[in-house]
Amino acid sequence: TKLTETLQLPCGAVLKNRLGKSAMSENMGSRGYTSNEKFNRLYGRWADGGIGLLITGNVMVDRFALGEAHNVVIEQGIHDANLPLWAAAGKKNGTHIWVQLNHPGKQSPKFLSKEPVAPSAIPLKKPLDRLFNTPRALSEAEILDLIARFAYAAKVCKESGFTGVQIHGAHGYLVSQFLSPTHNQRNDQWGGSLENRMRFVKEVYLAIRQSVGDTFPIGIKLNSADFQKGGFTQEDSMEVVKHLSELGMDLIEISGGTYEAPAMMGAAQKESTKMREAYFLTYCEEVRKRVSCPLMLTGGFRSAEGMNAALASGACDVIGVARSHAIQPDFPNQLLSGAPVTSQVKPLTTGWKFLD
């Protein structure tokens, strides 16, 4: 099957197969913002399950800007002696383990952040404004400091034995906020034109590249729905993807819909969900036309048949799985065996209408 093929990334690193675990926040960090034995056990188990690439849950670059209470943080002044053990556990069986680096921007909850920071002082829309305080606009000096923090964290990841990093540019967090004309209304070099709004992610990538060298994988996660909601035209978002690919990005992960079972199949779904799914599919096809960089698609993949079909069509190079891998850690081995397996994962709901 296509799933068992290796993949060489632009930096020269090789993934042993076409399956990747997309980031899911573990929420298991210790009190001092460090990782611990729980991470080693979890990622060791996943590495035994056959997957080619493990992407960790989001690791923050500033202890004063957390997305969740139990995030791990990598910054100067925090010594995490467990990082090499976590990396070693995730590298078993020739598996790649990349750390997802993130800053939440305005999406740091009230109980964690009195005054979150963002490109502009624009609150989140109702009813989310009940959970998050109105942010303060970042100064230029703070923006430069954040770029340096991403680079420092990536260097620590490399020195600790992790085999790559992924910039979290999705789900409305800081990188995504800079890109969005809705959230970024600055009138300096960091906002306004698309070129200016792209400057932050571009500088983060270049700073990381400088700190880790040319042979260490750097990926980014983007969400098609972010672009849809963030006031982007599809053309603008394609420019972002194309630019990142040309800079030398090793893997672009795209989420934001369901690839394998689109809503067009007639399942009872809200109109907004149907539109999002359709957008996601065309989005992925348009990205593929424009970039040479390897693509990882995450969303709704449940069956070996659907995964192989997506790879065979050329739509993507890596299949991203998340919940199915959490519930069945051996799911990759089953898929790679050629068996016609299907994940039994059911959609999760929060009970909050505006989120579900």
PLM regions with names:
Residues 1-356:
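Flavin-dependent oxidoreductase catalytic cores
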